[in-house]
Amino acid sequence: FISIVVLLAFSFSLQAAEKGIARAKGESSSDSGSRIALVIGNASYASAPLRNPINDVRSIASALKKVGFQVTKVENASLQSMDDAVRRFGQKARKSDVALVYYSGHGLQLKGSNYLQPIGADIRREQDIRFKAYNSDQILAELEDGSQRVNIVILDACRNNPLSRSFRSASKGLAQPRYQPPVGTIIAFSTAPGTVAYDGKGENSPYTSELYNAILEPGLKIEDVFK
């Protein structure tokens, strides 16, 4: 039903990450160290708008707050807004125990690199993608400098994007990251590389709906959240 690809960086310690998302029953947020999250949802595209991303980020933000995260939520972000939000989050992440970034919206891959599509991006040529879309490697680069034990990057961005069909070198879905992630990093996609998902018929995308329930399940280990 839901296909997920998870990349664990070398030397990643599951023992340190088992409580990275869900708390055991009776555990307060102060018991689990500093947890911060940045959630971004882009839906209001001029071409091929999406139904679910705004609901997705609001649902995930709500779930994360319930398990002790301090959440920054950004909706319908321009390229500049996405860049500013990730940079500010990267600075905060240096002092955190767990840093989580979640994105819902259009994305595509170009020559093996993954790009998240901002709102208002005027992408007319293949070359525009590099300059007018947000390279997801920048998220990993921001998290690389932190001392946090666990980094989690979740991309629900594999929706069927018409731009992927418009350019010769652009491919559907997202690619396995080429950027070497920081130690202690989990990267999760809503589908396998090179495949696409669709907006769900309900309030949330199918992937986010399952993720929401997994986050709120008490005592669930992090490796089980992404199964």
Predicted regions and their residues:
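N-terminal leader/targeting signatures
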Residues: 6-8
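Short secondary-structure boundary/capping segments
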Residues: 29, 143-144, 177-179
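Cleavable N-terminal signal peptides
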Residues: 3-4, 14
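Boundary/activation segment at the start of structured domains
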Residues: 10-115, 120-123, 128, 190, ...
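Caspase-like (clan CD) cysteine peptidase catalytic core
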Residues: 34, 79-104, 108-165, 205-207, ...
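Generic short N-terminal amphipathic or hydrophobic helices
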Residues: 1-3, 20
